[in-house]
Amino acid sequence: MAEPRQEFDVMEDHAGTYGLGDRKDQEGYTMLQDQEGDTDAGLKAEEAGIGDTPSLEDEAAGHVTQARMVSKSKDGTGSDDKKAKGADGKTKIATPRGAAPPGQKGQANATRIPAKTPPAPKTPPSSGEPPKSGDRSGYSSPGSPGTPGSRSRTPSLPTPPAREPKKVAVVRTPPKSPSSAKSRLQTAPVPMPDLKNVKSKIGSTENLKHQPGGGKVQIINKKLDLSNVQSKCGSKDNIKHVPGGGSVQIVYKPVDLSKVTSKCGSLGNIHHKPGGGQVEVKSEKLDFKDRVQSKIGSLDNITHVPGGGNKKIETHKLTFRENAKAKTDHGAEIVYKSPVVSGDTSPRHLSNVSSTGSIDMVDSPQLATLADEVSASLAKQGL
């Protein structure tokens, strides 16, 4: 029983290296070959619409039973009848849960039995090339034509209820399709980046080997030589000068005012005495009549007396109205009524028409008043 155990381990270790197209006849894989021979029957079942893609759990359980059947055939206990029974059990487990009529099931079993191939010569389990199997399911896409094992070949009964999740996890079933197997299981190694031609940014590697020399600087304390120092602006020319302010002596001497002379000759009349007390004020009457002369000869006519007071204004009564005569003799008599109320209320004849047609104006009072007014106005004007 140790040999089947060892072969089962080899299958588990090399499950990732199996190819889909490489199917070889090896010892203990007659059940896989039987399944390959039944490809036509499975395709016919798919065309009829009966088969469906199995679930991952069904396929995993089928591979577990397949591994057990292979181990039994190794021991020599397997026969044609047992192989047939194992094939029936595998197809029942690997097929989906869809129901099918019993007639089709019998036809699939009948076609599967004559398609069996004779067992291949046994090979030692320690051979360099691990056994390969193309009948793996669980990860293949349902639409790929090269994966017949992914779809059910014959209708089968529902999967057995007793399943071991631990054994399912142990058996590895990579996908059948070559594209999915290469992309998922065999990931290409990522090439390492070429770091020889990598350049740093902003030329930082140009001074990569530079070592700062700050630590090599020595600070030496030297005394300053001030012998050749020259002062600014010639201040050193009088460096030995000693101020003489300390030797000055302040001597107090009285001021001699005997020879002092006053300004502006004020001392020349210092002995002068004012003689204002001896002045006498005399009052004399001035004779303006004899000595004083008027300006512009105004005194020449000082004795003139205007003669305006001797003038007389004479008034003469004009009688030209009374003496006036009309140019034409119209034969009417002019009656003059005096404004003075008198006893005689009869109208008075102002004029009499002469034979020549002239009017006698001797007795007209209006003309007399007019003459008086004219003479009065002339008297006012001084004529």
Curated annotation (Swiss-Prot):
Cross-link (Glycyl lysine isopeptide (Lys-Gly) (interchain with G-Cter in ubiquitin)): 44, 196, 201, 209, 223, 240, 253, 259, 263, 273, 285, 289, 295, 311, 317, 327
GO BP term, pick one: microtubule cytoskeleton organization
Residues bearing the modification N6,N6-dimethyllysine: 105, 253
Location(s), subcellular: Cytoplasm, Cytosol; Cell membrane; Cytoplasm, Cytoskeleton; Cell projection, Axon
Modified sites of kind N6-methyllysine: 201
Region (Disordered): 1-198, 340-359
Residue(s) carrying Phosphotyrosine: 18, 29, 139, 336
Maturation and modification: Polyubiquitinated. Requires functional TRAF6 and may provoke SQSTM1-dependent degradation by the proteasome. Phosphorylation at various serine and threonine residues in S-P or T-P motifs by proline-directed protein kinases (PDPK1, CDK1, CDK5, GSK3, MAPK) (a few sites per protein in interphase, more in mitosis), and at serine residues in K-X-G-S motifs by MAP/microtubule affinity-regulating kinase (MARK1, MARK2, MARK3 or MARK4), causing detachment from microtubules, and their disassembly. Phosphorylation at Ser-204 by BRSK1 and BRSK2 in neurons affects ability to bind microtubules and plays a role in neuron polarization. Phosphorylated by PHK.
Distribution of this protein across tissues and organs: Expressed in neurons.
Residue numbers bearing the Phosphothreonine modification: 53, 95, 111, 117, 123, 147, 154, 159, 173, 345, 369
InterPro entries: MAP2/MAP4/Tau, MAP_tubulin-bd_rpt, Tau
UniProtKB keywords: Acetylation, Cell membrane, Cell projection, Cytoplasm, Cytoskeleton, Disulfide bond, Isopeptide bond, Membrane, Methylation, Microtubule, Phosphoprotein, Repeat, Ubl conjugation
A Pfam family per the record: Tubulin-binding
Compositional bias annotation for Polar residues: 343-358
The keyword Membrane appears for this protein: yes
Phosphoserine modification, residue list: 127, 133, 137, 140-141, 144, 156, 177, 179, 204, 227, 231, 235, 247, 266, 294, 298, 338, 342, 346, 351, 358, 364
GO molecular function, one term: microtubule binding
Membrane-topology descriptor: Peripheral membrane protein
Recorded GO CC terms: axon; cytoplasm; cytosol; dendrite; microtubule; plasma membrane
Intervals holding Tau/MAP repeats: 186-216, 217-247, 248-278, 279-310
Modified residues (N6-acetyllysine): 105, 167, 201, 223, 232, 240, 253, 259, 263, 273, 285, 289, 311, 327
Domain notes: The tau/MAP repeat binds to tubulin.
SUBUNIT field: Interacts with MARK1, MARK2, MARK3 and MARK4. Interacts with SQSTM1 when polyubiquitinated. Interacts with PSMC2 through SQSTM1. Interacts with FKBP4. Binds to CSNK1D. Interacts with SGK1. Interacts with PIN1. Interacts with LRRK2. Interacts with LRP1, leading to endocytosis; this interaction is reduced in the presence of LRPAP1/RAP.
Function, as annotated: Promotes microtubule assembly and stability, and might be involved in the establishment and maintenance of neuronal polarity. The C-terminus binds axonal microtubules while the N-terminus binds neural plasma membrane components, suggesting that tau functions as a linker protein between both. Axonal polarity is predetermined by tau localization (in the neuronal cell) in the domain of the cell body defined by the centrosome.
Name of the protein described by the UniProt record: Microtubule-associated protein tau
Organism expressing this protein natively: Papio hamadryas
Gene: MAPT
